[in-house]
A protein has these predicted regions:
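Rossmann-fold NAD(P)-binding glycine/threonine-rich loop
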Residues: 43-46, 50, 63-106
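Rossmann-like NAD(P)-binding element
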Residues: 29-47, 57-61
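A short helix-to-beta-strand connector/capping loop
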Residues: 32, 79-82, 146
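Anion (oxyanion) recognition and catalysis
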Residues: 10, 53, 78, 109
Length: 212
């Protein structure tokens, strides 16, 4: 993802201060002037989030797989006063799907619909279910009152496909998103980075998009 983000930044004429796999090697004086976009691994983010909060102007996190320390991370960013935007998926299209699924779930509540989520990704993806599928499941449960089962598939080089199904005795509704490449995730992360100007606190990307 790092190379994708670099490509989007170059395309938009945004200066890249540093692109590194060792964030702790960055000069703290430089870091304080920069927004960092983190697409690493769950273990790397867990090890580095305090350094990111302590040293950077703002932080955008696209890494998933740190749900078990989410409360701790958010609390620390508030404690040190560094703005942070995080998301399981920065694709603008996926975030539109989040909003659509939320609305449909609310409408269908009490009418006998059973939800199910299917997600397919490339074989290199470390987490299953995907962070996006977990967000979708949370949205469905909140609106419909039923927690959906999730089916995860890992095959080939699939960038990411998510399908949310609502099935009743009389019909079936499908809401889906298929990524053609990973560039959409990078574009959304750059959008998030531009949102950090004058931002305070910790925010999930989908909420900022809905309330813009």
């Amino acid at each position: 993802m790092g190379h994708m983000v670099e490509g989007v930044l170059h395309k938009q004429g945004i200066e890249i201060a540093s692109a590194t796999e060792d964030v702790c090697s960055i000069d703290p004086a430089l870091a304080k002037q920069c927004v960092v976009i983190d697409f690493t691994t769950p273990d790397a983010f867990k090890a580095n989030y305090r350094f990111l909060a302590d040293n950077f102007k703002a932080v955008v996190v696209g890494t998933t797989g740190w749900d078990e320390i989410k409360t701790e991370v958010i609390s620390y960013f508030y404690q040190v006063g560094t703005p942070m935007i995080y998301s399981a998926n920065f694709s603008i299209g996926v975030n539109a799907v989040f909003a659509a699924v939320a609305k449909v779930s609310e409408i269908l509540k009490g009418y006998g619909y059973v939800p199910h989520i299917e997600e397919t990704h490339h074989v290199h993806k470390l987490d299953a279910p995907s962070g996006t599928a977990k967000v979708l499941a949370s949205i469905v449960k909140s609106g419909l009152g039923i927690a959906p089962d999730i089916t995860s598939v890992r095959q080939g080089e699939v960038p990411g496909t998510h399908v949310v199904k609502f099935k009743s005795e009389v019909d079936k509704i499908k809401i889906s998103h298929e990524a053609f490449s990973r560039e959409g995730f990078a574009e959304g992360a750059v959008v998030a980075a531009t949102m950090t100007e004058d931002l305070k606190g910790v925010h999930e990307f989908k909420e900022l998009l809905l309330n813009k």
